[in-house]
């Protein structure tokens, strides 16, 4: 009996310990889940989160936001591919032409529109675009439109009606281009009358040869702080984004920008949830907050890019909304192109772009 009793006691103790361990494990899991739900990891462009922008969100929801700086769509894509299921981001900010690519490859979660009441505040003209029909995977945040910027103390603007004007000999060693393969190739493709989203290697090569003719005019390539070169006076003519125009004008730089007759190639930066997101609930809350009227207004005031929020646009000063260099007119938008994913052809763009930068 003692031996049997001992076996019973041992079994009881083992069962008790197992139950305790299971309980501890469940408690730890619950704690980890609670901690995860208290934090949202945001991967976005550096300038899109000016100081204090997210303070109100944390105050309202109790959710802490950890921000990582997004350097390029290509880097973001590669990082998410490499991380796989262990991906550490809840909200990302892909440009429209990467939304279609990532959605196709199963890298994005479908949005729950019932958790995004901000949808009713967004401009219908920005929604349901070919890159994301029905906005299943993304919501638009800001619009980018590159044009030809110039120092108004030196130029009056009549010199700039076409992208081809940047090739004029009078601009030798004076032109700043955006440090982005697609942006640079866009202007050459439009100059020669081709689709800026071409995937034809022969046409891409033709655009490269056209850019080699432009190379003697190129002083610099700059996408990090392209407005600063104009503010300092180092550059007086070049390719610039509309948001950068606002930044330069805030600094009282003598600068204006025009959109050439071929039209700009537009892009939209969006907010989306990666398929590997751990806090989908918090992600929806953050997207709702970032696209909301108050936040959208603050962001456009800070960095100049047009917002998708109609109510925020109404609240913005006219010096922004009525400046055609910042908010392109309806006619310009009709004459514009959308930057799309070029698939595997991106390798040709990147290869020729590196050769272009190395050329003298």
Swiss-Prot record:
GO CC annotation: periplasmic space
Cross-referenced InterPro entries: SBP, Sperm_putr-bd
Keyword set, alphabetical order: Periplasm, Signal, Transport
Subcellular location: Periplasm
Gene3D superfamilies assigned to the protein according to its UniProt record, in alphabetical order: Periplasmic binding protein-like II
Position of the signal peptide: 1-16
Keyword Transport: yes
GO MF annotation: an example: polyamine binding
UniProt record, GO biological process: polyamine transport
Family stated for the protein in its record: Belongs to the bacterial solute-binding protein PotD/PotF family.
Annotated function: Required for the activity of the bacterial periplasmic transport system of putrescine and spermidine. Polyamine binding protein.
Name of protein: Spermidine/putrescine-binding periplasmic protein 1
Name of encoding gene: potD-B
């Amino acid at each position: 009996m003692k031996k049997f009793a001992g076996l019973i006691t041992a079994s009881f103790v083992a069962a008790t310990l197992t139950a305790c361990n299971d309980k501890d494990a469940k408690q730890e899991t619950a704690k980890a889940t609670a901690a995860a739900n208290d934090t949202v990891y945001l991967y976005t462009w550096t300038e899109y989160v000016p100081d204090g922008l997210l303070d109100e969100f944390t105050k309202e929801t109790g959710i802490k936001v950890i921000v990582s700086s997004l350097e390029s769509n290509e880097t973001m894509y590669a990082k998410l591919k490499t991380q796989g299921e262990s991906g550490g981001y809840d909200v990302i900010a892909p440009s429209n032409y990467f939304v279609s690519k990532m959605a196709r490859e199963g890298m994005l979660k479908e949005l729950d529109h019932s958790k995004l009441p901000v949808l009713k505040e967004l401009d219908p003209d920005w929604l349901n675009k070919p890159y994301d029909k029905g906005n299943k995977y993304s919501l638009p945040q800001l619009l980018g439109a590159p044009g030809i910027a110039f120092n108004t103390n030196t130029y009056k603007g009549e010199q700039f009606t076409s992208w081809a004007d940047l090739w004029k000999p009078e601009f030798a060693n004076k032109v700043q281009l955006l440090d982005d393969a697609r942006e640079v190739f866009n202007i050459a493709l439009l100059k020669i009358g081709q689709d800026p989203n071409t995937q034809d290697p022969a046409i891409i090569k033709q655009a490269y040869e056209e850019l080699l003719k432009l190379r003697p005019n190129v002083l610099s390539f700059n996408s990090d702080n392209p407005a600063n070169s104009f503010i300092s006076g180092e550059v007086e003519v070049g390719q610039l984004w509309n948001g950068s125009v606002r930044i330069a004008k805030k600094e009282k730089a003598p600068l204006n920008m025009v959109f050439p007759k071929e039209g700009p190639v537009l892009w939209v930066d969006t907010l989306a949830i990666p398929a590997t997101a751990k806090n989908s609930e918090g992600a929806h809350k953050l997207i709702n907050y970032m696209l909301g009227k108050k936040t959208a207004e603050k962001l456009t005031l800070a960095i100049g890019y047009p917002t998708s929020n109609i109510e925020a646009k109404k609240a913005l000063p006219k010096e922004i909304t009525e400046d055609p260099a910042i908010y392109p007119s309806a006619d310009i938008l009709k004459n514009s192109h959308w930057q799309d994913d070029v698939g595997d052809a991106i390798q040709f763009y990147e290869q020729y772009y590196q050769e272009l930068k190395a050329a003298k």
